[in-house]
Amino acid sequence: MVFSLKESSDSISKPSSLKNSTIIENPEILNNNNNNNNSNNIIKSPNFLLSQKQRSINISNEQTQRELNNNGGNLDHRDPNSPKYLTSSHSSVVIPQDNSNNNNNNNIRISTSPILTEISENGLLESPTSPIRTSSTPTTPTSPPFITSPPFITSPKGLNSPRRLVGFFSKSTSYQSLLANNNNNNNNSNNSNNNSNSSNSNISCSNNSNKISRLINNSNTTDSNASIRSSNNNNDDFDNNDDEDLNSINNSSGIGIGVSSDYSLMGSSSSINGNTTTTTTNTYSYNDNDNVNEYSPKGKRLIRHEKSKSSPPLSPITPYYENLVIKGNYTNSNNYNNYNNYYYNNNSSGNNNNNNNNNNNNNNNNNNNNNNNNNNNNNNNNISGNSGYNNSRDDLFKRPFEMNKESSPTNSLIPNVSALKLNRVIKSSNGSTIFTSTSSDIASENDNNKNNENENENENENENENENENDNDSDSENENENDNSIGNKSNKSNSELSIEEQEKKKEKDLENYINMINNSGFITNDSNNNNNNNNSGNNNSFISNGSPFSPIKEESPQPSPTFSPKPTLQRQRSNSKNVLYSPNASPSNSCKIPTPPLLHNISIIDTSNNNNNNSNNIENQNNNNNNIDNNIDNNIDSIDKKLKNNNNNNNNNNNNNNNNNNNNNNNNNNNNNNNNNNNNDDDDDDNNIKKTPNNKINTNENPMIITNSVLKRSGNIDYLQINNNYVIPSPSPGTQLSECTNQQMKYNPPVSIVDFTLIEKIGEGGFGQVFLAKKKDTGEIVAIKRMSKELIWSKNKVSHIKNERDILAQGKNHRWIVSLVYSFQDDQYLYLAMEYVPGGDLRSLLSALNSLDEDSARFYMAEMVEAVDSCHRLGYCHRDLKPENFLISRDGHVKLADFGLSKNVVTRYHLRSASADNTINTTTSTPTTSSNINQLSSSMIEHTPMKFGAAANGNGPLNSSVTDFGSFKDLSVAARLAYSVVGSPFYMAPEVLQATRGYGDEVDWWSLGCMFYEFIFGVPPFDGDSPEEVMETVLKWKTMLQRPDGVSDELWDLISGLINDGSTRLGSGEKGVENIKNHIFFNGVPWGKLHDLDPPFVPLLQGDYDTTYFENTEKLDNNFLLQQTQQLSLLPPPLPPPPQTPTQPQQPSLPPQTPNDKMIFDKIRSPVVYTNTHSGNIITSRSRPRNILGFTYPRADDQPLLWNNNNNNNNNNNNNNNNLLKNFEELTILNNNNNKNKNKGNSNNNNNNNNNNNNNNNNNNNNNNNNNNNNNSNNNKNNSNNKTVTIPISTGRLLNEIDNCNNNNNNDENNINTGNLTPPNSSPFNSGENLNFEKQEPTSPYGSYSKQQQ
């Protein structure tokens, strides 16, 4: 998928190696010599407007022609002696030669991008011999000569499709505010970074920066005394006089270049002296005396940067304010004061700290109304204060102007660690915790004086309306009136108060606030201090569902560019997803800090017991006279009792809570003969520490309902836990408790291609095509990758397809990897139904923009590092990293795809295991044997790659950071390295090309370094006209890799660290990816929270079926699927199943038991066939030779492999026994005559109820408890010789022929014994034997298919 601009073959040519690069030109100017007298020719593109104004640089064709003629020499870029030899691949703009004799101003307009903030810092456009010219007359703003419209864009095939790139050039205002805090440009575009409720919230100090015209020019220096409104002026001037300010700058500076306020201002040098701003501008001009040579260093830099600026930016990035404001210090202290007030509150100057006496008023009210026991107005109005921040030192985020450029390479907001310290938590006298944000929150409660007066009036009215008034009421009224008058007299504007007075005022208010809390009846245990008659017009301390909320009233914060005005625990993200915020965790760069969390705001109601006999009923709203802490204790006690006192008639009473007593786990069911005593539960300790109960997900018929909390699924944060008043996100979805544990597992029929409606073909590869499809029954929109079995088997790529299927199947647990939805097969094709990623890929983005600025590139680089690390953690080396394989999701984030060349390996990571038995010591010199490796659980291998200090066979230390195994789960084979020469030549590491010494996952980091280079400069570091030339250049990388100009030291250090020897490359070694994440270029990047950031580019989609960002799409007619079905019908029928005798039992015949308790596998009777080792020991079906066993997905949840056969055909009521058992290693088959279950655990099985409880991992699978008085009649058979045979799981599963049924789409021919589909309520043999599994099956099924070592 490539986007390019219109090309003129007669005027501009491109190097052969840059066929995907874009060139901007004006055909009208180049081809029409009669219309070149006008020096203000403007390129217009009416069909595709990117912005209203845009800078451009004029290059004279006459001057260019003279420079080319003076150069001489061989200009062939293929000639090594030519000066173009080393620069042809790094230039996408070739200055054309004009053979016209007309010397008029025939100009080439190259639309430039304002992404690069300081182009002139390295003298990139500086002419060494050009004299300095000073403009004497200013250019009128009515005719700016350099403002041009963007070029007209077409597809490579000439089809005009301006809509196709509309998403690439849309300004991502949310990311702009993230990097530069330019809030005034973001409030009109539904951006969640601006959470203010005020209509004036779009006013910020960044308007000043937008009005300072920072223009880059070469030889003209003009100092203008243009007066820029300083921050102590009225804010409305900045909001209404944008064009006036801009025009005044243009008129005074003598430059006819207009800069739109929508874009960042480029490279100015500005300083504020009092109220006057001096703007220094430089103007580049090219005249007849300029001697800039195309092949000189200056000319090369000019060409390179003209190329990088030839397309509009991703988003306007404002520059640093190092000259405008240095660490928030103005030369004028009054200006600094007013600027702080203006920036943080967005109110008129002098109305910020006028409401500081309200706390004193309420303090007096709370101290004089101690004997009123009404449950009316139970609220302390002014404890929490306002969440708006008036002092930048207390801000939870540092502003861009408060950071040095060295300390934060990005223009993003970073967390202020000092503002997150524990001194923000105030401890009362009885140990209660009250959250306060800053002293400024305490100081400012309301927006203006009128709000104070209205509230005080309402308080006096409410006080007079109280039913139980006494003498203290009148006293409190008088004191309120006095305090109100004092507050009105003491209200002063910020302009009249000095900094010292404000600090003293804040300290005093903080003392009053603390005294108010200590004297408040809500905090102390004194029964006489029940402040239930607080004079407030709003009663926010109410009781809902029996759970008292915090007495702290949370006011809506003042308009602030950073903080959300919503006083709940829920905040809004830019992608409109709800995320719970944890105050004890450092926020990410784009977090909006909500107000402090409510105390104990979770109420749990047990709907299973309608009759609540608890004397401490929390729903009684007449107990407001008691202390709030006592109410909380009662709430905890009542919840504990409700958790313990379940219905005695419940047939499935399985209480396995670790926080409850053992005795409470005993079910008091008289009809239940099976009491499950969990010996691993801990007793409750009675101590003075008050614990808040965790929210347990009860899966009984009457579950516990969580109320008073906003609980939505968002990302990997699904459930809410409360611990010490902190909202803590729950673990990842893979470790969460299933919500349908006691529900019957649904058996989904196998999926085939006829279940989908193919909509459009969106891609085509070497093995097949990719279609956009919709599932007919569920409406799921997926991308189906259809691959030909004939091609796969002929090219011996079966193992590659297996690896791709395994990685995609685990993608649901990794947000950086495209996840698999379905996988199935027929006789002709393999199908992978993946999630549809509609944003295209990074190659399309680079083709449209040609290059990225460092700030935008940093975002994509960080996400690419996370994606590659996720692949390595799964135990795979990608080996084919390129921009085409990084897809852009609908929310703008990156996902890694196309794992067709991935190699299943075990990378050198630290083994993070909680069990010491499963940990391999990598520091000792003793070799790790294969037997020790086999002791590792499959889940560790799958999700936590292992680290080896020696080869698996004990022959010595490894020569690489990756050990490759022939089968991903077969760890008993000897470790070896990868030797295949695969990948794209532009991004291929030298060790892959040599392929004699082997390589590991460090080759992926080399590929990332090459892509980072291409992000900045538009071309890969190693280029050539043919793959052979590219490979030769890669092998000579030490001499061919040169540092271009215009790249920062931090970025080049990162690139050179990745494009390096494998032994010293970043990402290799003991620390691995941590060395990359800790690099100075990624300072300030919130690793682990990148999805909270707003990406630079978000696709503009018109619907779920939008394929705008995919090229060469093809709509499918209605007969396409019918034709495919007819082709399948013409195939020869599958092989018939082997003959079966009628008297043959339906249970497998067990061979003699070996001394090692392992059964010799009968290959003659096997329904499967192993392929050779070169195909990865793939298992296929005998009946269908090209059917790959284990390919069908999903398997773990929806389509069971094995069933727990506790019930037989005569017992169909017990449907809870159909749960899939996972993570098993061995299979124990018990004969029919056995009425006891042999378990390694300590579970109690009474009255032959066949409760298969695995207690090895302290997990009680109590879903299989049959709570009735009827014993299983099938288990009451004759008790004769009990025989137990232990079979390896791979052999046992193959012997039972289960996978041959489930993994071949459950075809009738696959079931050898019956010829029919195995019913879900019984085992495939339906003979009544008891199958007990001790460990779970791995997510990747190939671990059980490893060839047995006999």
UniProtKB/Swiss-Prot annotation:
Residues 236-246, 454-482 have a biased composition (Acidic residues). The active site is at D880. InterPro entries: AGC-kinase_C (IPR000961), Kinase-like_dom_sf (IPR011009), Prot_kinase_dom (IPR000719), Protein_kinase_ATP_BS (IPR017441), Ser/Thr_kinase_AS (IPR008271), Ser_Thr_kinase_AGC (IPR050236). The keyword Kinase applies. Its EC number is 2.7.11.1. The keyword ATP-binding applies. Residues 1131-1142 have a biased composition (Pro residues). GO terms for biological process: intracellular signal transduction. Belongs to the protein kinase superfamily. AGC Ser/Thr protein kinase family. This is Probable serine/threonine-protein kinase DDB_G0278845. It comes from Dictyostelium discoideum (Social amoeba).
